[in-house]
Amino acid sequence: SVWIKKLLNENKLRYNSHLYSESNQSLRKIPQTELEYSNEKKDVDARIILRDNFDKLLSKYPELIIFGEDCGKIGDVNQGLEGLQEKHGEHRVFDTGIREATIIGQGIGLALRGLRPIAEIQYLDYLLYAIQILSDDLATLQYRTFGGQKAPLIIRTRGHRLEGIWHSGSPMG
């Protein structure tokens, strides 16, 4: 009918745009950087590499915060954040309770307010406890608000340890 066609045309833009970021921070607009490798070989624990990189990021970006279970005091379960709470303060690197859905919800709220949060979920198999918030809230926010809001949240986790039934699972198969 004419009425349906008119309605479809009127709402085409609203329902078919802003599915992906169109901002300057879009992955499609970030220039690619070529990898550079040193000829010098040096064995370093991965946790040290991670810690040093997070340290540099926290120093460079005052709006960056890292939080999750055991992130603050002990520097995460594998010490990839070791000493960073002492160095950067307990408002930038801090612990949360053991509720993955709450951690993701906090991250969304912080991102909506202009901060750049890194929400740590201890193990990959625990993401399932936050899947509804990830799929219904975080993943669709920009689309649902017609590009009016975005929540640039980084979720950090680990998995595939293959050490028994706990902390080794993966929703990826």
Language-model features: locations:
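Thiamine diphosphate
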Residues: S1-G173
